[in-house]
Amino acid sequence: MLPFVHEQIGTIIVNFFILTVVCAITLLVCLAVLTAIRLCVQCASGVNTLLFVPAFYIYNTGRNAYFKFQENRPPFPPEDWV
């Protein structure tokens, strides 16, 4: 074979190897970014479940109790007691 044919084949092999390495690195970076986003979503879901849902429950329960007992208030004392 002619020497320039060997050079072209070697160049093709090297370029294929470089392209494969670049694709693998790009795939790893994308995987790391998607994993970080998934972790952030899981943390936000945990904060929602552990912090906000109980707070909304306590707030709604207290508000309902307040409105329920507003109807059953004792009357005000007479003016001469003051």
Swiss-Prot record:
InterPro entries, per database record: E_MERS-CoV-like (IPR044379), E_protein_bCoV (IPR043506), E_protein_CoV (IPR003873)
GO biological process: disruption of cellular anatomical structure in another organism; viral budding from Golgi membrane
Intravirion domain ranges by topology: 38-78
Keyword terms: Apoptosis, Host Golgi apparatus, Host membrane, Membrane, Transmembrane, Transmembrane helix
Listed transmembrane segments: 17-37
Main location: host cell
Topology feature Virion surface, residues: 1-16
Cross-referenced CDD domains: MERS-CoV-like_E
GO cellular component, one term: host cell Golgi membrane
UniProt record similarity statement: Belongs to the betacoronaviruses E protein family.
Function in brief: Plays a central role in virus morphogenesis and assembly. Acts as a viroporin and self-assembles in host membranes forming pentameric protein-lipid pores that allow ion transport. Also plays a role in the induction of apoptosis.
Subunit structure: Homopentamer. Interacts with membrane protein M in the budding compartment of the host cell, which is located between endoplasmic reticulum and the Golgi complex. Interacts with Nucleoprotein.
Protein name, per record: Envelope small membrane protein
UniProt organism field: Bat coronavirus 133/2005
Gene: E
